[in-house]
Amino acid sequence: MANLIPAVADMGPVWLATLIFGRDASLAVAAIYYRWASLPAPKTLARYWDFSLPSAEVHPTTVSKYNTFLQLILVGGTTALPLLSAHSELLPAKLTFEGVVRGLQYVVAATTLWSGASYAWLKNAVKILGENEELKAKQGKRGRAIIGVSFATIVVLAVFLAQREDKVEQDPRHEV
């Protein structure tokens, strides 16, 4: 999904692409940590890439699955928007395909925020394998902190980009 978002970024808001891609990047950074932290000794790069040595299991959250579904609908709708806009008479009065896609963008933004937060807060999203419960709890807490801090940084960046985009829309002469 993350590969499709930059491809349509010029057809949609950059802040939303940043939010979606940033959530995925936050999860990827945390996955790197989880793998390294939970890998049994000795920790080597060869063992890191040896997936016959499982050390953690990721369980996608329900909201994350809905978010992916909504992202696919958004990408499809955004891609089809030029074609659909030519036939706006198919919609009831005061409703446009652009408005529908805009509304879907906000829904996707909300579910992306919810999804990112769920990985940061839910303890059952990642199960670290092993027998030392105290160590597993510590590694899980650090991994969720990595997701939380990195995703919060992305959210701040997305808000900044949204405000900047809003200023440009209000005043086209505004320099970016």
Which positions does each model-derived feature cover?
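C-terminal membrane-associated helical module and adjoining short loops/tails
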Residues: 34-176
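Multi-pass membrane catalytic core of lipid/isoprenoid biosynthesis enzymes
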Residues: 1-36
